[in-house]
Curated annotation (Swiss-Prot):
This protein's name: Rho GTPase-activating protein gacQ
Biased composition regions of type Low complexity, renumbered to the chain: 51-60, 276-304, 324-344, 358-375, 417-427
Keyword terms, alphabetized: Coiled coil, Cytoplasm, GTPase activation
Pfam families per UniProt: RhoGAP
Ranges of biased composition (kind: Pro residues): 494-508
Composition-biased stretches (Polar residues): 446-466, 475-491
GO cellular component: a single term: cytoplasm
Site for Arginine finger, residues: R100
Length: 531
């Protein structure tokens, strides 16, 4: 019994010890968790401070990729442009497919990070395609492209001009409107691209190929997404196909102009002098078209028809005298209302009646007023010309009969012309037809022709037509002919007899055996089998 009680006590003690150990472990774990949470908070605070410091440092450092070009009046070119173009002039001018083939993405991203963090970059001599694609990425990711968004439509408009000289002049104007630093960078890039084109026999990069590959990095429209930019570039690729070639082939004329890099005045900046001049063909055609047009006469008053003869009449008149100019003069002119009379000239046109108009001018220094008389020809105010009189009708139409005196008959009936007047007016008309009442019908007689080809009337004569002859019979009498004779007791010819037909004799009819014969045949067969 004692032994059992001791074991129970030991077990109870062990259980209590285990409980104490578990409590200690829980306490230690809580302490560890508290320490970890405190450490995390400290680390987060430290990271926040570091991020703030890094952001301040990054704000001071300009981003290379995805940024913008330097200030307008800065003289130094970007380092990435200078390093990449210098490298490509040494190792990329004779590499085939330069700017067309892309380099490895990993090396491009490593160089991008170096440029963004403002660290030194060294290119190995065998990475021409990587450096070329790095240069394209820098120009493509600028916030504002080298040829700005505002000038995109201007460059596209230059491409649509067929005359090369006019196109070059317009390109010079458009490039002159770019910001000064953009012009400087553009000249630096195109001087390098001109060397690439000179080695096109080796690198296979012609101006047209460069316009397809390199031009979208410089010239692009303003869009929100990359898909829109691609869509615009594909649509405008046909219009910008020869733009790069026209700039490269005329590099000296465009970029070597001393007026290109001169600072523009405020007036020049305020003026919008970019107006697309017409091409040579269009200009000549328009000038010839304008010169061929007749001069337009001054317009007649409101409600009147346009009179095209007033221009020549007014131009032939002498100009009115001009009074001498006096200092501190005050003039008062009075024009009376014009009196217009219309008449018909020889050419059947309404003429202008001259009207003498007096203008009185009074000047303060001179006590006596000066009067000047000028004659003006005013156009008719009525749009419809007046009806011609009898005299004018007789002059224009001398062959017409005189008008009737009765006004009612004049308005209702029209004058009729006699045969004599018709023959005088229209000599080529045929003679008039006779009246039907006066015409009589004549008997119709037959007409025959003589040997002398003269038509003479003859009487009808009876002619005896001989009967048809029937050939004689070829053999046999009339009795043997099966065909009946005709009404004229004439017989038709007899056909030859048919040849005898080759016929076989008829087959004999087989005899049907009787019952006795059938039994005899059966007996004979049975006897033969038994033997």
């Amino acid at each position: 019994m004692k032994f059992g009680k001791k074991k129970e006590k030991e077990n109870l003690e062990n259980i209590e010890k285990d409980k104490d150990r578990d409590k200690e472990k829980e306490i230690k774990e809580k302490e560890k968790k508290d320490k970890k949470s405190k450490d995390k908070k400290k680390n987060q605070e430290i990271e926040k401070d570091n991020n703030i410091n890094n952001n301040n440092n990054n704000n001071n450092v300009k981003k290379v990729f995805g940024g913008s070009l330097p200030f307008l009046f800065e003289e130094e070119l970007p380092t990435i442009l200078v390093q990449t173009i210098d490298y490509l002039q040494l190792f990329g001018l004779q590499t085939p497919g330069i700017f067309r083939e892309n380099g490895s993405l990993a090396s491009i991203q490593s160089y991008r990070s170096l440029y963004d963090n403002d660290k030194p970059v060294n290119f190995p001599p065998h990475e021409a395609h990587v450096v070329a694609s790095l240069l394209k990425a820098y120009l493509r990711e600028l916030k504002v492209p080298l040829c700005t968004f505002e000038h995109y439509d201007m460059f596209i408009a230059c491409e649509s001009i067929a005359d090369e000289k006019v196109k070059v002049e317009l390109l010079k104007k458009v490039i002159a409107h770019l910001p000064p630093f953009n012009r400087k960078v553009m000249k630096y890039i195109f001087s390098f691209l001109q060397k690439v084109v000179e080695n096109s026999n080796v690198n296979k990069m012609t101006p047209d190929a460069l316009s397809i590959v390199f031009l979208p990095t410089i010239l692009r429209p303003q869009a929100n997404t990359d898909l829109e930019i691609l869509q615009f570039t594909v649509e405008d690729s046909k219009s910008t196909k020869t733009l790069m070639s026209s700039i490269l082939l005329n590099y000296d004329e465009i970029f070597e102009d001393p007026n290109l890099f001169q600072p523009r005045t405020r007036q020049a900046r305020a003026q919008t002098d970019f107006v697309s001049p017409p091409s040579s063909q269009n200009s000549t055609s328009s000038s010839s078209y304008l010169s061929s047009k007749n001069p337009i006469s001054p317009r007649s008053p409101i409600g009147s028809s346009p009179n095209f003869t007033t221009a020549s009449i007014l131009s032939a008149l002498p100009p009115p005298p001009i009074s001498p100019i006096l200092s501190s003069n005050t003039t008062n002119t009075t024009l009376p209302p014009p009196i217009i009379t219309s008449s018909i000239d020889d050419n059947n046109e309404p003429s202008l009646s001259p009207r003498i108009i007096t203008t009185t001018t009074t000047t303060t220094p001179s006590p006596q007023p000066t009067t000047t008389t000028t004659t003006h020809r005013l156009p008719p105010s009525n749009p419809i010309p007046p009806t011609p009189t009898s005299n004018s009708q007789s002059q224009l139409y001398p062959n017409l009969p005189p008008p009737s005196s009765d006004p009612i008959i004049k308005s209702t009936t029209t004058p009729t012309l006699n045969s004599q007047s018709q023959s005088q007016l229209y000599p080529n008309l045929p003679p008039p037809l006779p009246d039907k009442n006066k015409c009589k019908l004549l008997p119709i007689t037959p007409i025959t022709t003589n040997e002398s080809n003269t038509l003479q009337p003859t009487t009808p004569t009876s002619t005896n037509i001989p009967p048809l002859s029937i050939p004689p019979q070829i053999g046999g009498n009339s009795d043997s002919n099966p065909i009946s004779p005709t009404k004229n007791q004439s017989q038709l010819p007899i056909l030859p007899p048919k040849p005898p037909s080759l016929t076989l004799p008829p087959k004999p009819i087989p005899k049907i055996p009787t019952i006795l014969e059938y039994e005899n045949n059966v007996r004979q067969r049975s006897n033969t089998t038994m033997v």
